[in-house]
Each structure stands twice: as C-alpha cells, then as structure tokens.
C-alpha cells in the first residue's frame, strides 16, 4: 500500500492542510464572489491577491450529536437563584431596528478570507480550456526532450555522476581489501620507533619483517586504484519525444476611428482576461498581438493595450497579417493555432467579402478555433437580438459561422457581458459553446 507524505512547508502564519480543506469546502462561494467582482468591471484587478467575504454560517464544521427526539437519557439540570418552577422566561430585549441587542450569542457577520493571486486565478479559470489543444492526427514529431534514465558506464565527461562513481569506488576498495593509508602510517611509525632503539639481532629482524610488510601493502595499494575506470558512472539521458501540443493565440483588435473609448475599453478588458487565462493555464503558449486600422501590424503587449494610434477601418488587413505570420513562424504540423478578434463591426465597403474569402480559403483550415467578439452599444443589444441582424461584418461572419464548427461569434455590450461571453467561448465542453 503506497504511503504519501506531504513535506511541503506551511505558508507563514497559515496551516496549509486546513487552508486547502477550506478552499475545497468553500470553492463555489469563493468562485461566485470572484465572478461578481469581475462582472462589476474589476478584470484588471484579477491578477492580484483578493479578500473575499463569506457568510459565517457556511463555514461551520459538521458534528455528530444525540437525537433529542429519541432514546432514554438521565441527566441533572443545575438550579438557579432567579427562576422557580412554573416561572415564565422573558424574551431577550432588542432595539427598534432589525438587529438584536448586545449579548454573548454567536454573530452571523461575514468572515473575510484572503486568497493569493495563484488561488484566485486557479478558481477563476478552473473549468475553462483551449478547445482541441492536442491534434487528433499528429504529424511527424521532430522535437525531443532529454529525460533522465539512470546511469551508464560510458558517456561525455560533463555527464559524470560523482556521487555514484565514488560509491562504486568505495565498494570495490572494500571488496578487494585495498590497504588504507592509516595502516601504512602505523607500520612506518613502528619502524621509526625500532630504529631509534639500540640495535640488536631481534630488533633488526623485526624491522626487516615490518619493511617487508610495508612494501607488500604499498604494492597492493598501487595495484588497487582509488578510482578505477570500472567505477565511473555517467548520467544517462534518453530522448523523449514531445507531443505536438504547442499553441499560439492570435489577438486581433480593431483600434480604428469608429472604435470609441468605450468600445476600446471593452475590447481591452476582454483581451486582458484572455491573456490571464493563457498565461495561467498553459506553459507553452505563444501570444501574437495584432492591432489594425486600415493597416495591420504585429505589436508587443504594451503597445497592444496602451498605444493610442487610430485611423480608418479595413478588417481584412488583420487577417492577412495573421496568415503571413503563420506561414513564417508557425507551421501547422507543429502548432495548434487559435485566434480571438474584437471589433465594433464597422468595416470598409466591400472588405467584408474579402474577410469571408480569407477565412474560408485560408485561416479556418489552419485554425483549431476562431472566436469573434463584436462590441456594440447597449441600446443595440435590444435591437440586434437575433444573430442574423447587425453590422456588415457580423452578417458576413454569420456565413462563416454556419460553415465552420470551429468558428464562434458573440456580442458584448457592457462590462458585465465580458465574463459570460468569455465562458461561452472557452467552456470545457465544446457542445456548450454552440448551444449557449
């Protein structure tokens, strides 16, 4: 039967076991509190420590007790100096409001629990994932990772395992009874002591015997090396093929003049949430940021979120830039390719047909998943309730949505819509995204 010993150190002033047990019990309450903050527009504050209030009544430990309605018990109730048999006990006094008077009973106030940044992100993104991250038909695997596979008797000098080598050397010296230096030093001292005494036949005979023994031990010591080539061990590494699960996410954001500050703010909040999700849940995920007006270009993270450049609107330039980067840096045989696009739906006349052509003929054949988010006015959310109504880009993308199952499109009208839309796009169950 395996025995697992948890040797992790407790955080400062905390009990790790109790903390994890509480997180399991209060998981749903904690997730609800975090999501309420995000719906209120606090996405930028998600990547930090949080103080979450939890009702105290939900934190009690379950206990076993006697059933007062059954069984037979004998007990003695203590007397008192205030009441006699038959007296009525008055109700406890209270104030004029809804609260109760001061007393010694247990309070039902909220209890505040501090969650670390890692715990917040783990709870928030617990049931989300990139769809179809590992391809079903993997092509030839070209990348390998060295993995420790024990020891070998030959190898490169840089891979010598000193500990295992000295262990083998020590065992061999014991087995072959290699003389120790202390034994030779002891015989040499005896010879020196005898030579200091007056010479006699017995002393000379004893010195000759000791010299012969010393010579024999030295010869044996030279024959049995301290470290023999047979002792040397090298760390052995076997090449382990890496699964073809590298992923790249293309973030395409419209920053043209038609996108006002409100629309840009909602788009940036969506991409902040996406960026946190990718960096927290996946170790090897490249993120490519593309901003576009009438021109599109790849930018760094800071420029993507904070640059103020504006201009006309030609959405197809962003799709063309994405296709160019895929051909240059991300072979489809080695990468899972994803894309998320945010725009207000305004586009140059005739360019929406070009977008359909790029998606149908090129990008959708390369992408595992493509998500389009359209930023609309809150009043438009009531007018464009049906998916077939909307901007020219929305109507054009509707044709793509009906043809490609790995294409999804949603609308965002207010900060409170960001998280529900994000969950619909990246829910763990693929069928929920279509039905949502």
From Swiss-Prot:
InterPro entries xref list: UPF0229
Residue ranges of the region described as Disordered: 54-103
Swiss-Prot/TrEMBL keywords: Plasmid
Pfam families xrefs: DUF444
Signal peptide: none
Superkingdom of origin: Bacteria
Record NCBIfam families: PRK05325.1-2, PRK05325.1-3
PANTHER family from the UniProt entry: UPF0229 PROTEIN YEAH
UniProt similarity note: Belongs to the UPF0229 family.
Protein name, per record: UPF0229 protein mll9637
Annotated source species: Mesorhizobium japonicum (strain LMG 29417 / CECT 9101 / MAFF 303099)
């Amino acid at each position: 039967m395996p025995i697992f010993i948890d040797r992790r150190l407790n955080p400062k002033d905390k009990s790790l076991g109790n903390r994890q047990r509480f997180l399991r019990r209060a998981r749903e309450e904690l997730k609800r509190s975090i999501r309420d903050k995000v719906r209120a527009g606090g996405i930028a504050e998600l990547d930090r420590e949080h103080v979450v209030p939890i009702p105290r009544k939900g934190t009690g430990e379950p206990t076993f007790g006697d059933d007062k309605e059954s069984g037979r018990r004998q007990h003695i109730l203590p007397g008192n100096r205030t009441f006699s048999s038959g007296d009525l006990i008055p109700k406890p006094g209270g104030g004029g409001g809804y609260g109760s008077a001061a007393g010694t009973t247990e309070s039902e106030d909220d209890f505040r629990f501090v969650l670390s940044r890692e715990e917040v992100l783990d709870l928030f993104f617990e049931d989300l994932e990139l769809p179809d991250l590992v391809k079903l038909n993997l092509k030839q695997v070209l990348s390998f990772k060295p993995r420790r596979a024990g020891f070998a008797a030959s190898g490169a000098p840089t891979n010598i395992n000193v500990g295992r080598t000295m262990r083998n050397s020590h065992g061999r010296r014991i087995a072959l009874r290699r003389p120790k230096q202390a034994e030779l030093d002891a015989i040499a001292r005896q010879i020196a002591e005898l030579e200091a005494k007056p010479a006699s036949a017995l002393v000379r005979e004893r010195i000759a015997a000791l010299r012969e023994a010393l010579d024999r031990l030295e010869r044996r010591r030279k024959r049995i090396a301290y470290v023999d080539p047979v002792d040397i061990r090298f760390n052995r590494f076997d090449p382990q093929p890496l699964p073809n699960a590298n992923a790249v996410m293309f973030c395409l954001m419209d920053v043209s003049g038609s996108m006002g500050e409100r629309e840009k703010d909602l788009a940036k909040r969506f991409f902040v949430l996406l960026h946190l999700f990718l960096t927290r849940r996946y170790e090897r995920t490249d993120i490519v940021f593309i901003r576009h007006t009438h021109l599109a270009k790849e930018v760094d993270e800071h420029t993507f979120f904070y640059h103020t450049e504006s201009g006309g609107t030609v959405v197809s330039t962003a799709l063309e830039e994405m296709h160019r980067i895929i051909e240059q840096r991300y072979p489809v045989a080695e990468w899972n390719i994803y894309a998320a696009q945010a725009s207000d739906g305004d586009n140059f006349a005739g360019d929406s047909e070009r977008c359909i052509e790029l998606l149908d003929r090129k990008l959708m054949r390369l992408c595992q998943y493509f998500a389009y988010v359209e930023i609309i006015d809150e009043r438009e959310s009531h007018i464009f309730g049906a998916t077939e109504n909307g901007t020219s880009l929305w109507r054009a993308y509707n044709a793509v949505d009906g043809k490609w199952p790995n294409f999804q499109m949603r609308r965002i009208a207010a900060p409170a819509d960001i998280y529900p839309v994000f969950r619909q796009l990246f829910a763990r169950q693929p069928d929920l995204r279509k039905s949502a």
